[in-house]
Amino acid sequence: MKRRNFIKQLGGASALAMVGGLTLPSFTEQQKRHITILHTNDTHSQIEPFKPNHNRNPNKGGVARRATLIEQIRSENKNTLLLDAGDIFQGTPYFNYFGGELEFKLMSMLKYDVATIGNHDFDNSIEGLYKQLPNAKFDFVSANYDFKNTVLDTHVKPYKIMVKDGIKIGIFGLGIELEGLVSKKMYKETAYLDPIEVTQEITNQLKNEENCDLIICLSHLGYNYKRDAKKISDLNLAKNTKNIDLIIGGHTHT
């Protein structure tokens, strides 16, 4: 299938021992590896396709269509990663009624590998998110949310390491500051850590201690904030850190 068509509907990136213009130093020209990276973000409980008369996304989306695309691309390359950058919850009656159970079960059926947490994933409270974790047969990563005084302690890791076609891949997550965006009673004692400082520490660990060939950030910081230059975004993150090969972003629906 045409990758461009997939990207328009789902979002994805392919790598042939090269991601974001950075050649992986671990592999020579004779040792090229091929991985495919598929990703979603801000799906907001959109289980069904948008209606044909929808003003922005007529007859697009839906889990069934996503499943078909993913299956087709996996058949072309078994070394495929499937990632999500947060805001899985909220937006349709499916979430209002099932509280996230359906979203996690369907993502598990699609065999997602890793996801990070968005602000709307707290919409049914941190306890509500925790309650649904058994339905998620994939891992959650968040390096700058400290959950040690919450029910999510030990259930969300800062990063996950995977190996695809001999490429060692470190995947870590970052979330937006919740204060002022989400009611305190929803995220309880979740502590927000500076994404820049956390990233410098995590990427150094992944690169120099874990010896990862490729480092991916699942970010729910938002792409850019022109009206608030001090607010940390994906662009700020890229400019002020090193060792990230690929940022997969969410939140601003960019």
Predicted regions and their residues:
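Acidic, metal/ion-coordinating pockets
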Residues: R3, I7-T254
